[in-house]
């Protein structure tokens, strides 16, 4: 591990010198590239320097303790020695996490798809509840969200809703929401008070740039139609809604939330790019995958990841066996406790799988 940390510090020093080179400063593309690399390395290098400083303090304290000292001074040095050792253990743990390879998509914006599954109108209603929870979470993080496409129901739910969330690190925190979410509650229409179980599926995709995915225009079939609202009534008198079919894969995306056909097409292409990128990523992962499944989950949309039980006020994440009796707060957008626990487990898994390499 320490060879990697020293190499990171050496590279950081090298880049810092390059950033003061007039030739680099005058080349904006090169300058931006080095600035990004410098920013990516900064946290781990600062933490490694802190580790080196504390290690030196421990050595100095140890040397003093080997000398003949008066009682009061020895006690003071002994206390400093113990505190420095405890601090060093904390820094070591932080460094282990920082050295875990970062998901290249972590800083990206996301496209989220929520679809009602088993349970009819109840599933559609909960799709709306979960959409609002994620929208509130985005607001708490000061991220921006925008609906790209939706199929609302008359009772205020969604058969399907597709939206973007824009903000630094959005994918790093929301990627764990992909999968099947199960809700257990008594529907308002249920006179006997019987609990119903419904499911919805969530897919979280990193938003990708045009340069990340090559799409041949001849592979696309583009259809226009009139946008419709809840219950199917037409809300626009022109054919502004767009449906794009990517013929090689059969992927179909649509967007009807803008009045402009051009804007709807741009948004639909944004969704398509992310879907094609996801397929390419999955193929790449499968090629290098080990014969194990992460405890946090594969991100498979068919995997049941979480249950929301209204009568008990309970939320259970099945991937990490975490239960919180904070249903109301979670659905009000307080997702950090769940997400932090998932990230911690994911990092521990990655550290465990990489421990053999550290020899």
From Swiss-Prot:
InterPro entries: PCRF, Pep_chain_release_fac_I, Pep_chain_release_fac_I_sf, Prokaryotic/Mito_RF, RF-1
Keywords: Cytoplasm, Methylation, Protein biosynthesis
PROSITE patterns, per database record: RF_PROK_I (PS00745)
One cellular-component annotation, GO: cytoplasm
The record's account of how the chain is modified after translation: Methylated by PrmC. Methylation increases the termination efficiency of RF1.
Subcellular location: Cytoplasm
The keyword Cytoplasm belongs to this UniProt entry's keyword annotation: yes
Main location: cytoplasm
Residues the record lists as N5-methylglutamine modifications: 233
One Gene Ontology molecular-function label: translation release factor activity, codon specific
Entry-linked SMART domains: PCRF (SM00937)
Homology family: Belongs to the prokaryotic/mitochondrial release factor family.
Function field: Peptide chain release factor 1 directs the termination of translation in response to the peptide chain termination codons UAG and UAA.
HAMAP family: Rel_fac_1
Name the UniProt record assigns to this protein: Peptide chain release factor 1
Organism: Ruminiclostridium cellulolyticum (strain ATCC 35319 / DSM 5812 / JCM 6584 / H10) (Clostridium cellulolyticum)
Top-level taxonomy: Bacteria, Bacillati, Bacillota, Clostridia, Eubacteriales
């Amino acid at each position: 591990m320490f060879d990697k940390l020293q190499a990171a510090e050496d590279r950081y020093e090298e880049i810092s010198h390059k950033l003061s080179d007039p030739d680099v400063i005058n080349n904006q593309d090169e300058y931006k590239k080095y600035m990004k690399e410098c920013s990516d390395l900064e946290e781990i290098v600062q933490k490694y320097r802190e580790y080196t400083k504390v290690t030196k303090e421990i050595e100095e304290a140890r040397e003093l303790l080997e000398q003949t000292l008066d009682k009061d001074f020895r006690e003071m040095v002994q206390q400093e020695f113990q505190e420095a050792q405890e601090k060093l253990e904390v820094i070591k743990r932080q460094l282990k996490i920082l050295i875990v390879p970062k998901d290249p998509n972590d800083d990206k914006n996301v496209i989220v798809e929520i679809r009602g599954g088993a349970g009819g109108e109840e599933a559609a209603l909960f799709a709306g509840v979960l959409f609002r929870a994620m929208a509130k979470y985005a607001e708490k993080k000061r991220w921006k969200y925008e609906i790209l496409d939706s199929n609302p129901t008359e009772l205020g739910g969604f058969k399907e809703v597709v939206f973007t969330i824009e903000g630094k690190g959005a994918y790093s925190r929301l990627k764990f929401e992909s999968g099947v979410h199960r809700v257990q509650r008594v529907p308002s229409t249920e006179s006997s008070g019987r609990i119903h179980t419904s499911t919805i599926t969530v897919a979280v995709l990193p938003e990708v740039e045009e340069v990340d995915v090559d799409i041949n225009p001849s592979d696309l079939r583009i259809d226009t139609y009139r946008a419709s609202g809840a219950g199917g009534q037409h809300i626009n008198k022109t054919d502004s809604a767009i449906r794009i079919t990517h013929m090689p894969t059969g992927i179909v995306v649509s967007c009807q939330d803008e009045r402009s056909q051009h804007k709807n097409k741009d948004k639909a292409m944004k969704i398509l790019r992310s879907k094609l990128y996801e397929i390419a990523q999955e193929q790449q992962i499968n090629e290098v995958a080990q014969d194990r499944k992460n405890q946090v989950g594969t991100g498979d949309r068919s995997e049941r990841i979480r249950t929301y039980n209204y009568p008990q006020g309970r939320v259970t994440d099945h991937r990490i066996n975490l239960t919180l009796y904070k249903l109301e707060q979670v659905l009000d957008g307080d997702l950090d406790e769940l997400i932090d626990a998932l990230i911690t487990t994911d990092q521990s898994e990655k550290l465990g799988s990489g421990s053999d390499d550290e020899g």
